[in-house]
Amino acid sequence: MGKPRLPNQKKAYKELSKRLAGYMVRVRNIYDRLNEKAAMLVESVGYDGLKEFSFDDYPEIEREIKLLQSQLVEEMRTLIYSGTSSEWKNSNTFQDAVADKALKYYRAQIHGEKFKHYYRDNGDQLNAFLQRKENGLNLSSKLWNQSINYKESLETTISTAIEKGMSATALSKKLSRYLNDWPSLQADYQEKYGKATNIHDCEYRSLRLARNEISMAYRSAEQARWQQFDFILGYKIKLSDSHPRYDICDDLTGDYPKDFKFRGWHPNCLCYTVPIVMSEDEYWSDNRENSPNKITAPPKNFGEWVDKSENLERIGKANGKGTLPYWLRDNAKIKDCSVLMSKARTYGDAIQKQAETIARKYDGVVTPINYKGFSSMYRKLNSEKNMLVSDIKDSVRNTIIVEKENIKSVVKELQSLPTFDRYKSQTPEKFCGYSGNIINLKMPNGIQAEIQVNTPKMIYAKETEENARRILGDNVWEQIAKETGLQGGLGHKYYEEIRILDEKKDKTKIAELTKLSKSYYAHFR
């Protein structure tokens, strides 16, 4: 089945990069103009460079310095507002062409009333984007903070750059060079004053803020339009040809759901996106919304990246500081899963130790602590209607394995713990013949931990041979095999076969497998 050939996204992002470079030139021009004025003020007060420069020593130019700061705020705000509005429009113009191409391929009426929603430019979302606050700061507040940094940077730069008899013109050029080359300023300041400077790279911060705001406006407009395009199944996030070095961008390429909000993996991200579109048959299908080709979850490599301990540690720290990246802040389910996984790691060792202490009293063993992976957690959230991440009670889990006569005693000990929250009995009738005990513990950071309690025989029946041997040991596994004369792990096999069947279409097959599963588990109870 063919698909529409859409306008070239890669080329569009290359054009965006060129325009962004133009905006950066304008930011540097703003700083050059301000540096000229600052140099003239320094010349007017006769600063001789015998000690470090401070504007506080020259109250006669206090008003002019405040005007300089206000000028920085106003000119940067004008540039960013103008740039975001222009790129919102550019993005929409390109998406108009995408809609035209798609509708033409699908042989639909491009200007028909039915397809008007494809062409909404979402101006209300642009206004919301411009007025938004992040960590309590709107754009004006961020720029005013930068103007304070600029004033402090000027003091350090003037102290470093000044030479006896230097003209305002020469000083302004040196100020611009230093503010555009932060490492040189730091090195020269250290050499001149014998100490490190603790100020921030203000010009770079302004460049980054402008570039990110304008780039995010383009991406946000694009994604708003894609929500209106019901012919889009998802989209690919791809590396730019200009990608400078290996980083998170390499790890997270792939196909994403179209409701995954992407404004870049990091500041100045060069990745670009390409929509995945329907074939003509899919588009005119009565069940278009449920296309089997619809992307419903992030790619496998995304989950693997989140699962890594070092990344979860970074996510946990960023969440605590309120500095999560946009791709987490903007995607609630993904953020909630990632933060929960990070919190689960905090108490894994303590839960394992607690379970082992109880198991030893009854000559039992404990499975190694297991953390629920991102893909499994995200799939669970998406598959159950109205489920919240707080409903997930097994983000961290293990199993205590003891003989049947000790089960009640172990459960009682777990129920006596101060963190005990809930007990659940897994009955054969509800779980295809499998039976067990689940204890949930509520940890101080709010997560729910799960400790299961079961017998060696039930583990033999439920787990694959490889897993069961690892948990029980070869001697116990072989003893149960000899005693029962039954193959181990069929419970897991039946479960996996049932899990992938359709409840409505495969009722008969599900009933057959359920009967087999119940009969099998009955031998191990």
Regions found by a protein language model. Give the residues of each.
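N-terminal leader/targeting and assembly helices and adjacent pre-domain segments
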Residues: 1-188, 192, 279-338, 342-355, ...
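Short, hydrophobic/amphipathic alpha-helical patches that form generic packing surfaces
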Residues: 66-81, 209-220, 453, 463, ...
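Active-site-adjacent structural elements in folded domains
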Residues: 137-143, 193-194, 256-257, 380-386
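Long, positively charged binding patches that form subdomain-scale interaction surfaces
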Residues: 144-247, 392-410
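Acidic, glycine-rich two-metal-ion catalytic cores of nucleic acid-processing enzymes
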Residues: 193-289, 412, 419, 425-440, ...
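Conserved catalytic-core segments centered on acid/base and nucleophilic motifs
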Residues: 272-275, 315, 401
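Charge-rich, low-complexity segments
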Residues: 330-391, 507-525
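Long beta-strand-rich cores associated with HINT superfamily self-processing modules
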Residues: 382-525
